[in-house]
Amino acid sequence: MTNLRKTHPLMKIINHSFIDLPAPSNISAWWNFGSLLGICLTIQIMTGLFLAMHYTSDTSTAFSSVAHICRDVNYGWLIRNLHANGASMFFMCLFLHVGRGLYYGSYMYKETWNIGVILLLTVMATAFVGYVLPWGQMSFWGATVITNLLSAIPYIGTTLVEWIWGGFSVDKATLTRFFAFHFILPFIITALVIVHLLFLHETGSNNPSGINSNSDKIPFHPYYTIKDMLGLVLMLLSLLTLSLFSPDLLGDPDNFSPANPLNTPPHIKPEWYFLFAYAILRSIPNKLGGVLALLASILILLIIPLLHTSKQRSLMFRPISQTLFWLLTANLLTLTWIGGQPVEQPFIIIGQLASIIYFLLIMVFMPLAGLLENYMLKPKW
């Protein structure tokens, strides 16, 4: 009798995706983040579902319903802290996953990469609408500032903003629809993840060398299941440490005050994972220009495959491009720092320089470095 795992229509799909999947023998721990992101998504959907059972999406009760979850619901404080900090872990894994893709040339699998960029945008949208739900000061003003950016769109901008708000300001209608969006988007993300994996399994995984590994494959289970479990333990340990010892470390103190449309917080800023984009937005002293730069900072990922000039796929054997990659990393950390600072000197000029360097590195210096490295590989005699 043949193995049920290999014949049953449903089990067969799982088997080909997670058990008998041929994987390169040399993929490093940087390839763990895909599975970690899957775990993050699962944790977020589960904790989110339990929070939704007790949350009310009404301006008069939203803030107190979150307080009620933390005080009166069994382990409500834990569920809420896991959900809030789980979002941070999600973005940490996402940024490392994208960074891995950039470093090792994984973007050459264009369909997988493009679906990945769409996934990144969808997760960012989900996190944004989710941050509005507790209806604290930063929730309210964050929603006001970010939705207001759409008014920069010529001709239809103002109408579009009022349509999204469901009125003439961020109010009850906005909160209700944001809750609806926040509930549905994770399921859309799950569907996109399946498509992402579908395209990935058409080609198989890339590997650190960037060389075709068809001649040397090993089964995913047990080799990479056990390796992924190590990553999982480390991530869960980090998440639990953060959620149990310092749950409010990454949050904003202003969000402990209920939303008040008559009182603007001194510094409006998003969660840490949006600060780099927020810094780019603020670095341009023009509303439409800032919005376009903000969009470009993320959408630039879509043209990365077109900017690949090197004969080698990975940066593993390309020291000049490696240096530029780590400069880009440092630059993004600088932007993250600037996004959390007030709009005054010297932060303004640092933010503007970092924004220019960000686009220059990706669009000019890295493609040129690829060409230079190609030239250096040619025999000169």
Curated annotation (Swiss-Prot):
SUPFAM superfamilies hit by this protein: a domain/subunit of cytochrome bc1 complex (Ubiquinol-cytochrome c reductase), Transmembrane di-heme cytochromes
Protein family: Belongs to the cytochrome b family.
Known role: Component of the ubiquinol-cytochrome c reductase complex (complex III or cytochrome b-c1 complex) that is part of the mitochondrial respiratory chain. The b-c1 complex mediates electron transfer from ubiquinol to cytochrome c. Contributes to the generation of a proton gradient across the mitochondrial membrane that is then used for ATP synthesis.
Major location (coarse): mitochondrion
Residues at which a ubiquinone binds: 201
Stored Pfam families: Cytochrom_B_C, Cytochrome_B
A Gene Ontology cellular-component term: respiratory chain complex III
TM helices/strands, residue ranges: 33-53, 77-98, 113-133, 178-198, 226-246, 288-308, 320-340, 347-367
Organism (species): Distoechurus pennatus (Feather-tailed possum)
Residues at which heme b b566 binds: 97, 196
Name by which UniProt lists this protein: Cytochrome b
Biological process annotations from GO: mitochondrial electron transport, ubiquinol to cytochrome c
Positions that bind heme b b562: 83, 182
Quaternary structure (record): The cytochrome bc1 complex contains 11 subunits: 3 respiratory subunits (MT-CYB, CYC1 and UQCRFS1), 2 core proteins (UQCRC1 and UQCRC2) and 6 low-molecular weight proteins (UQCRH/QCR6, UQCRB/QCR7, UQCRQ/QCR8, UQCR10/QCR9, UQCR11/QCR10 and a cleavage product of UQCRFS1). This cytochrome bc1 complex then forms a dimer.
Gene: MT-CYB
Single GO MF annotation: ubiquinol-cytochrome-c reductase activity
Cofactors (names): heme b
Comment on bound cofactor: Binds 2 heme b groups non-covalently.
Protein keywords: Electron transport, Heme, Iron, Membrane, Metal-binding, Mitochondrion, Mitochondrion inner membrane, Respiratory chain, Transmembrane, Transmembrane helix, Transport, Ubiquinone
Location relative to the cell: Mitochondrion inner membrane
Leftover remarks: Heme 1 (or BL or b562) is low-potential and absorbs at about 562 nm, and heme 2 (or BH or b566) is high-potential and absorbs at about 566 nm.
Top-level taxon of the source organism: Eukaryota
Key word Lyase present: no
Membrane topology: Multi-pass membrane protein
